[in-house]
């Protein structure tokens, strides 16, 4: 058998003159979409050829084969079945690929020569709206970025949900934070150099011609799309970079979707000052919806998400990644949750929502005219629930709940229309028929009656023909090619009546047609075709009617989403014993008996609650204690409590009083960032630098073991300097965990003639024989032991190694390598020298070396100096 190396032969040809008509048709379609995978419809398969086939075979793990040859070379080919293509399409989109779907136009059986084909649809990671291609509980976003001397403009759209937003940021750090928050599936950038490092290698980045990101052309694009004379109503007149990005995004959507987008009706502007800022590192460290190792289990979202509907789940995720600083909004949410709990209404709402479905995305498909029959039935059932939801909300006095009650609107007429028009359980596809309910349209009912009665007519005809012909084995049947027929076996064919006309000859039988059967066939087949045609017409009419109601229906879906989130908050508060936080205008952070929501959820034994008390005169806690003692857990739990309070949730504490917070910034144990060529220590210093430059007196900062990535005294010096800067320059709320006991002396120092604003707390452990028991309780004052060797033994180090470590520890302590005074001479940190692991006494060689100036030496002088130094050793 001849084999072909598809990796070295048969690249996509430059000339198509010598190719077969089919391959010429393929190349014509491919030339319009050179960067996309082309799904080329051939019967029951979508085929891919040449480089597309190689790529798809690798990504989808499907067979790479060949389809004969064309132009004198074999044609690499791979294919996926039409009936299962959506699964393959979803996998490609998840990998950041875009696909052009080239369909057969018309009926191939009726085509004379080559069947016509045309690209009817383009699917990209950021523009998908099909239910099968979407994660139901996560937004699928398309983002565009423009840049200028002033910074970056961002625009992003959720085409499946009908949202379109813009923003502007000043710095690369802020840009990275926004991308980390929004996690776009597809990112459009100008095809230029010098983009930030974090964009390189990112899945779904599309480079577009730079001229598409021009502010003036973007403005014209937006005005034309929204049919407006100015953009003042959107509040983006003073945002040229955002306008440029929005125009580029809109142009890409129109280019790929090939249709109007009536569900995008406005642009919203996000205001950075309205939300608590969190950079990419903070989101990663706090494990909001993804753990540091990439797992999505045992995260804050996993514990918090008690929503019933997919659209509620997506809204909760958005809230979680953008905690608000708007006190009035948050107080209204807290009050709404409390009102639901007090009235016992959360359970009733959640029960009603179980039949609700994803109305938000269904309405998008209605707007795009791609809604399927079961979208209609889901929308019908959801609207039918509104009276029950209104009844539940009516007696509640929460201002926010009453606002949402009003936003539900009145949709009785639409509900009644769908109840009367749509079958109780419609089929998956319109082409299957039976979507429109009986009794809705008299003409359709009559056509269906003709089709329905056909079966009985055929039974009666078969019995009559058997009786009249005397052929007991005579059968009446139907196939799609030849239509209706009367079948008689070969042995009985001579008995066929004279008025039978032969229609088809088989090996063992003859098939006939009669005038009566032909008349019936014409009538029935016509009725079925007309029935499907009539259903399609009525279906399009429903889409037209619903299209006029879209704005009100979208508001209704938004209100239902928020009610789902608030009811979920109420359920979590009761199930997990959480309390309503208090938002204070004074600077403070007081948490009584706080717990870590995720750790508490996964533990099979009670969680040890702890307090936190920070205010104007006490802004930093230096936290000491053994490894595994709970320092990181304590810091994270307080950050998560603050975050939960600022999305409107209750919090895992008996009481929480929280003053104004503008940022949450963290530096908690990152691993090596090898992909970007950065060591653990480099990452640590970069994140620390960001915090020192951005923290304000209203920021909450978590610092975990600063300085551990370098030598002992280097690390100690850095940790001391960072702590002082945070306490005295930034003056932010800081939780500073450290293994340097010397830092506990900072609390006793004065600053600007007053107290330091620093306090010591520790997490303790006790030894019971050879066992070490962690207490996990936060106590005032510094720790007096680290228990490092005991933790090493717990980790399974060989006993011989632990014993050797104990001996070495005694030696080091006797040599003064480690101070037990818990104090550090400040001058030691100010001295301009580099300390090693142990401090050696000065020597003549060292003094001679320090006297040298390498920049002033010639090569010969340097060599002579080296010999002199060697002689001193």
Curated annotation (Swiss-Prot):
Family, similarity comment: Belongs to the DNA mismatch repair MutS family.
Protein's job: This protein is involved in the repair of mismatches in DNA. It is possible that it carries out the mismatch recognition step. This protein has a weak ATPase activity.
UniProt-recorded name of the protein: DNA mismatch repair protein MutS
PROSITE patterns: DNA_MISMATCH_REPAIR_2 (PS00486)
Organism the protein comes from: Xanthomonas oryzae pv. oryzae (strain KACC10331 / KXO85)
Keywords for the protein's UniProt record, in alphabetical order: ATP-binding, DNA damage, DNA repair, DNA-binding, Nucleotide-binding
PANTHER family (UniProt xref): DNA MISMATCH REPAIR PROTEIN MSH1, MITOCHONDRIAL, DNA MISMATCH REPAIR PROTEIN MUTS FAMILY MEMBER
GO cellular component, one term: cytosol
Positions contributing to ATP binding: 625-632
A GO molecular-function annotation: ATP binding
Pfam families xref list: MutS_I (PF01624), MutS_II (PF05188), MutS_III (PF05192), MutS_IV (PF05190), MutS_V (PF00488)
GO BP, one annotated term: mismatch repair
NCBIfam families listed in its UniProt record: mutS1 (TIGR01070), PRK05399.1 (NF003810)
Entries under SUPFAM superfamilies matching the protein: DNA repair protein MutS, domain I (SSF55271), DNA repair protein MutS, domain II (SSF53150), DNA repair protein MutS, domain III (SSF48334), P-loop containing nucleoside triphosphate hydrolases (SSF52540)
